[in-house]
Amino acid sequence: MTGLYYEQFDIGMEFKHSLTRTVTESDNLLFCALTHNPQPLHLDEEFCKGTEYGQRIVNSLFTLGLVIGVSVGDTTLGTTLGNLGMTDTRFANPVFHEDTIRSVTKVREKRESKSRPNAGLVIFEHYGFNQRDEEVAFCVRTAFMMKTPL
């Protein structure tokens, strides 16, 4: 499926994305390497044995990127002009290696662009859940969306 245009989004619309992903150790290691993040909570098994989790946790920005990325095919693929910002980000529970993440997206609000007659702003709520239905990530994202071409 391709993304939707501005006019196709309705406030309250909800997407339960069918694409899921089981997060691997390699995902976490590669993300940490690519972002130059040496945090021992993500990389050092021995260090993590002494934490409240007892094991490594997945980088939260990987988790957020996954939750939003999974939404693209159903919402913004080929129809967005870019992200304008994210707010209210939270990580209620950690993600561990081998957790399976699913995503839900809701349309919170939308409005016409004040500067671009061919575009509008859609504000999404993105939710990520693990296989135990625990929320692992949330954010509010403002997307600059194309209007249907004339």
Predicted regions and their residues:
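HotDog/MaoC-like acyl-thioester-processing domains
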Residues: 1-11, 91-100, 104-150
